């Protein structure tokens, strides 16, 4: 199993239209064939000192293996998302894990 976790910090001055386009784009990533399971969401309302809720969107993708992740990275839907939405975030952090 290969888990790809992506955290986006959206720019504060985005219009509602730009935010909607971002969310539509990020959710489209979960439809890519090599994704076993995908989730895109906002920070939960949990409130403990150890929890970082500063991000705007968490994208969690589960793949069967690294090869499936690599197929996702070069998929046209992924390329379209980057092309159309990369200017919407000020910061992105990615954490990949395997077991």
Segments (PLM) and residue ranges:
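Short S/T/G/P-rich N-terminal loop/turn motif that feeds into the first structured element of a domain
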Residues: 1-56, 64-71, 98-99
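Conserved short beta-strand edge segments in small beta-sheet-based binding/regulatory domains
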Residues: 35-40, 84-96
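C-terminal structural segments of small proteins and small subunits
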Residues: 66-92
